[in-house]
Amino acid sequence: VIETLQKQEKVQLIITTHSPNLASKIKLGNLIICSGNNAFPMGKDYTKLKEDSYVFLEKFLDVTKSNLFFAKGVILVEGWAEEILIPSLAKAIGIDLTAKGVSVVNIGNVGFDHYSKIFLRKNVPFMDIPVAVVTDCDVREYELDGNEYERKDNIDSERKSKINEIESKSFENVKYFVAPHWTLEYCLNLSDTLKQEFQKIVKSIHTRGGWNSDFEKELARKLIIGKLEKTEIAYKLANYLDSLENIPLEESDTICYLKKAIEYAAGN
């Protein structure tokens, strides 16, 4: 009905809803998000979205992703592993994302700009909904040298430069949280808190390979050739986290970036 009415001329239709299903059927430019004491129109004159983003979002904003319009906080991720793991990690550090009204939205590999700029305004007032963007730094720490995968030398400056480049995209209420090493999985393997359980799970899923001789190198090889079962690993690690309470995550832990993203989106 909504889609039909939107095609008619000289008809003004006003709908108030908390339904992501209905919101996903309305043209993005016609939406108005009410937050606090302000109303934020989503039209082209108000947001920092480009024309192609409107076209893209009207095609790909499904019911699940439309949850972000009703959230008190948003965490944007680019893969199933993060989407599965973050709610369980949040619970393990004492934050209930559901109770806080935080939505974790998996945008896949389409780029964050399409989604994050929904929340960026051309003029004041700016939106007060915290948006945490969680992403990998994607600087490989191993490379193929002949027939062997070897650790790259002197990548600290390259990694730091890439992280700074990504974090510089933070603006207004949108903040980027970047994996300090390569990918989520690589950071899990370096984590003081979860390394042991992560390695146990990986070995239970990938029963073949040189895990016992050099786990890090085998992990790097799997990441490079795209053969790591990231989703299954995340499910099992999430189940493990669900059994924990108040786990310590120090600032130096390589997955602390996830904790910071959770805290930011939850308003902690």
Roles of regions detected by a PLM:
Residues 16-18:
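H-loop/switch region of ABC-family ATPase nucleotide-binding domains
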Residues 3, 8, 23-268:
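Acidic, divalent-metal-binding catalytic cores of TOPRIM
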Residues 9-14:
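Loop/turn-to-beta-strand initiation segments
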